[in-house]
A protein has these predicted regions:
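Alpha-helical, largely C-terminal catalytic domains
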Residues: 1-753
Length: 753
């Protein structure tokens, strides 16, 4: 009996099939035999695959559906890649997941890595069918692609192999990931970014290097990956979870997290799949063309990006059709419900599907996403108790920092009206004192020396000022172009060569503060660290544009995009990066990019972001007209009340904190051993982890103490000014500078931290 009934899928693009499918079926069967995949023994007896297994799984059909336009030779190559990756997955399962052999699994993966060679390097002799297949495919593919593509493909292939160890470790511990951890890790282990690289091969259209790391292209790949993986999890739950004992499946993850039935969890996974596909469409049709026009990309490169996006869309449609037909999956009735082949083709044909049922989930989700009322009276949201296992530590220099911080803000002009903005001062002195950012700095960087604490306080003040100023200066007028110009100016005040003096004259407190902070921060840093910290600041500032854009559209963000962008708008990388400055030269390059430390940091970041959204809910929703709040995003996505949404966000924060503790107890010691760090470097990394504890406990304490989130304070601050002879109505983006019955002197833009 099937575990659940498959939900109604959002299918906005028709599947098509490549005419060379029969040729590739014959070719890939012979290729797999030649590589040794059809006579590899399984430890429990029998073979990993035999000829019948490969025939009924029909990977040639998968590739014919997912790459409908490529020629026969290319389809053969693509099909062989998929045969290889599925063989790797099944061989790894048989050899190591069932046996729990972590050491053997690591050796197996390390052996495969040696076959991803650079120009002029000779691979070793293969010791098994997976190595033989990879050596052959590398020789047939990589010489025809650019160095940039090779670099990206090595990374995605590395991830899908290496992160199999994460799955194996969770199986051994009988541990099911939390939803956020699962989405992040599934991208790495699930292989869809790898599939996106092969779309470039099949389409003969490489993504231009200058766009490969941009937000639109990254979102295209991430939404594609998430949709592919979520769809696969729905179809494969029966086999993976009920029959094979896997625990890396989104249906199982949500079933456990929400304590709901399998059917309810499947419906939630499908809702998330729909949301990710809608974001893919928005990004492909709006953000990506706008970026190409802004960068002045030549027509040929624009065509390549369009072909890549269309290839990803074809993959989604074809991948669904294959899942609906393959013997590998639970799919009773799915093929008939998918609508079959045919229909109009190409990006943007979602309105021309013959069956309304195939687009109805998307229409329902899109309408709810844009239906948020303005300034609803939500009242205070009780958000305690928050799980916090770490003690609070406070700097002895707090009082000095408080005195210093307000003087610095005054000197930078942050407490005065900025000419040309059309609004009053972003803050007055009492606003700044009520914020008490020095108190926050004294806890998140509790071990800082006096001058370091001053610097940390000033960075918090600068980031919070900018986050307030953007909606006030640019939001109410919807002047997104002016916001973009301001954003483009800010990097001028962060020169990588600190000896250069060609920055323009600062035009406002935001620029003046950044110029001052950069001189005080970047001077002692190594060039690599300086570049990394500069990127962290830029990422935060650019995320403010994303918020303005969503406000202009009155669009409540997709939950996955919100969580990932919230880390940026919160300035998480920037504030965490400040704590690394003193120890930058004492650790090996690249260690902060390992899965262990990135997962440790993102778990901490999400905890902090969620607690901020819980405490600031009334302030942001009722008084500022925000759409960027995790409680609201949860309300909107799940169509639940605010108390239910609050409880879910509290549970998510706890899950991320428990993951943080899990990594501290297991992943961090393994990382230190694997990198063979000396005592000094070990002390730096463990000190960094300790600092993250201070960071989270300090942010929680600051929110508990800070006036700005308390209902009485908010009502007083936003009360009508009796001196005003007129009332101000909501006007434009975020309405942060225009409240009903509130004077411009009392209406302050939303602090997002």
């Amino acid at each position: 009996m099937d575990a659940f009934t498959l939900p109604d899928f959002y299918l906005s693009h028709p599947a098509r099939i490549n005419q060379h499918v029969e040729r590739s079926r014959r070719h890939t069967m012979e290729w797999a035999r030649r590589m040794g995949m059809l006579d590899t023994p399984a430890p429990r007896g029998g073979l990993v695959w035999d000829e019948h297994d490969l025939a009924v799984m029909d990977y040639a059909l998968l590739c014919a559906y997912t790459h409908p336009d490529c020629d026969g030779l290319t389809l053969d190559l693509i099909t062989d890649w998929y045969v290889w990756v599925f063989f790797f997955d099944d061989h790894f399962l048989e050899m190591f997941k069932y046996t729990g052999d972590l050491a053997g699994g690591q050796d197996y993966v390390d052996g495969l890595e040696r076959f991803m060679t650079a120009d002029g390097e000779d691979p070793p002799e293969p010791a098994n069918a997976a190595e033989a297949g990879l050596r052959d495919l590398w020789r047939r593919t990589v010489p025809h692609m650019s160095d940039d593509w090779r670099r990206r493909f090595i990374l995605s292939t590395h991830n899908l192999m290496v992160e199999s160890m994460w799955e194996l470790d969770n199986i051994n511990r009988n541990r099911v990931a939390n939803p956020i951890e699962y989405i992040q890790m599934r991208r790495r282990v699930g292989g869809a970014p790898w599939s996106a690289n092969l779309v470039e091969v099949a389409a003969g259209a490489e993504v231009p290097p200058e766009l490969a790391g941009s937000r639109p292209v990254s979102v295209l790949v991430d939404t594609f990956a998430d949709a592919v993986h979520l769809r696969n999890d729905l179809f494969s739950y029966q086999r993976e979870v009920r029959e094979e004992g896997e625990n890396s499946n989104a249906v199982l993850v949500l079933e456990r997290f929400f304590d709901c039935s399998t059917q309810e969890a499947a419906e939630l996974v499908n809702d998330l799949l729909t949301s990710r596909m809608l974001q893919f469409e928005d990004t492909a049709l709006v953000e990506t063309p706008a970026l190409m026009a802004e960068r002045g990309l030549p027509p040929g490169r624009q065509a390549a990006v369009a072909a890549f996006a269309k290839g990803l869309q074809d993959w989604q449609a074809g991948g669904h059709e294959w899942h609906a037909r393959s013997s590998r999956y639970m799919n009773d009735g799915a093929a008939a419900r998918s609508g079959g082949l045919g229909g109009p083709t190409g990006l943007g044909t979602s309105a021309a599907r013959p069956a309304l049922s195939s687009v109805e989930p998307g229409l329902r989700r899109r309408s709810r996403q844009h239906a948020q009322p303005l300034l609803p009276q939500v009242g205070e949201l009780e958000c305690e108790p928050m799980y916090m296992p770490f003690a609070l530590v406070r700097s002895p220099y707090l009082d000095d920092a408080r005195v210093y911080a307000v003087g610095w803000a005054r000197e930078m002009g942050m407490l005065e009206h900025v000419p040309g903005t059309g609004t009053g001062a972003v803050w007055n002195e009492q606003d700044f004192l009520d914020l008490d950012l020095a108190y926050c700095a004294s806890m998140i960087h509790a071990d800082a020396e006096r001058e370091q604490l001053y610097l940390s306080s000033d960075w918090l003040a600068w980031g919070t000022y900018g986050d307030d100023a953007y909606p006030r200066w640019f939001g109410a007028t919807r002047n997104l172009e002016a916001a973009k110009l301001q954003t483009e100016r800010l990097p001028m005040f962060m020169p990588l060569d600190t000896e250069e003096d060609d920055a323009p004259e600062p035009a406002n407190p935001l620029e003046r503060g950044l110029a001052d902070l950069w001189l005080r921060t970047a001077g002692p840093m190594r060039p690599e660290a300086r570049r990394s910290f500069r990127t962290a600041v830029q990422v935060m500032v650019e995320s403010w544009l994303w918020e303005l854009h969503n406000q202009a559209l009155n669009r409540v963000p997709d939950p996955v995009d919100y969580i990932e962008m919230r880390r940026r708008t919160f300035g998480s990388d920037m504030t965490i990066g400040l704590s690394r400055l003193a120890h930058d030269e004492e650790i090996p390059e690249g260690i902060y990019e390992t899965r262990t430390l990135r997962e440790l940091e993102t778990a901490a970041q999400d905890y902090a972001c969620f607690l901020n959204d819980l405490y600031s809910y009334q302030k942001e929703i009722e008084f500022e007209g925000e759409v960027h709040n995790m409680v609201l995003v949860t309300e909107n996505f799940l169509d639940v009340g605010r108390e239910t949404a609050r409880d879910i966000v509290v549970d998510l924060a706890r899950a991320r904190m428990e993951q943080f503790e899990h990594i501290l107890a297991t992943g961090l010691p393994d990382l230190l051993d694997a990198w063979e760090l000396d005592d000094r470097a070990r002390a730096v990394i463990t000190g960094h982890a300790e600092g993250l504890k201070y960071w989270m406990s300090g942010i929680l304490e600051w929110h508990r103490a800070c006036l700005r989130y308390k209902g009485d304070y908010l009502r007083r601050k936003h009360a009508p000014d009796p001196r005003a002879g007129f009332s101000w109505g909501p006007s434009g983006l975020g309405t942060s500078a225009a409240r009903l019955g509130r004077s411009p002197s009392t209406a302050a833009g939303g602090v997002r931290s």
